[in-house]
């Protein structure tokens, strides 16, 4: 197992992506962005409506990755929290990989409300050593409100 670090993130409004840029600058890690083949609406409320309509079992097609998570000792995963859970593109990514032996450091961004999605991440990454997550809470205007561990 390599000691290299891979940063994987999904962003919709840009907040999670901004955090990813900071992490990449500090760690000099490799980076992959999760991008759904069919983009979600830019309007957050339309996206929420679509996600609820699609249902909890929906998994969209996402971009192909150039990096293999198994070739990294550590993977940092960043994602927003959507409608009380992990976004469908993130679930597609998590379910497509073998996490045994990988160390995961997660961070979650959320729009104003703290929702614990850590158990959902744990259930999708069987065999990984998962660190306690960081929760970055923002309001809907992108103002930072709180940091929770």
Residue spans for each PLM region:
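Structural signal for conserved beta-strand scaffold positions within catalytic alpha/beta enzyme cores
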Residues: 33, 106, 132-135
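Conserved beta-strand segments of alpha/beta enzyme cores
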Residues: 28-30, 129-132
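Glycine-rich phosphate/pyrophosphate-binding loop and the adjoining helix
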Residues: 131-149
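Short beta-alpha junction loops
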Residues: 108-113
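Redox-cofactor binding/interface segments in oxidoreductases and associated redox assembly factors
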Residues: 77-78, 106
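Active-site-adjacent betaalpha module
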Residues: 116-117
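Short, conserved loop/helix-junction motifs that constitute active-site signature segments
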Residues: 69, 95-102, 124-129
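N-terminal beta1-alpha1-beta2 submodule of the flavodoxin-like/Rossmannoid cofactor-binding fold
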Residues: 1-77, 84-91, 95, 144
């Amino acid at each position: 197992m390599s000691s290299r670090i891979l940063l994987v993130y999904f962003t919709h409004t840009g907040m999670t992506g901004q955090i990813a840029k900071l992490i990449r600058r500090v760690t000099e890690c490799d980076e992959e962005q999760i991008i759904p083949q069919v983009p979600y609406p830019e309007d957050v409320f339309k996206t929420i409506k679509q996600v609820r309509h699609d249902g909890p079992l929906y998994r969209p097609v996402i971009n192909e990755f150039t990096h293999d998570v198994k070739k990294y000792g550590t993977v940092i995963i960043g994602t927003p929290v959507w409608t009380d859970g992990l976004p469908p593109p993130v679930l597609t990514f998590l379910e497509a990989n073998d996490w045994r032996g990988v160390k995961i450091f997660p961070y979650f961004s959320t729009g104003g409300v703290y929702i614990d999605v850590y158990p959902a991440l744990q259930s999708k990454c069987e065999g990984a050593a998962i660190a306690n997550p960081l929760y970055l809470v923002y309001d809907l205007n992108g103002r930072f409100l709180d940091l929770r561990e």
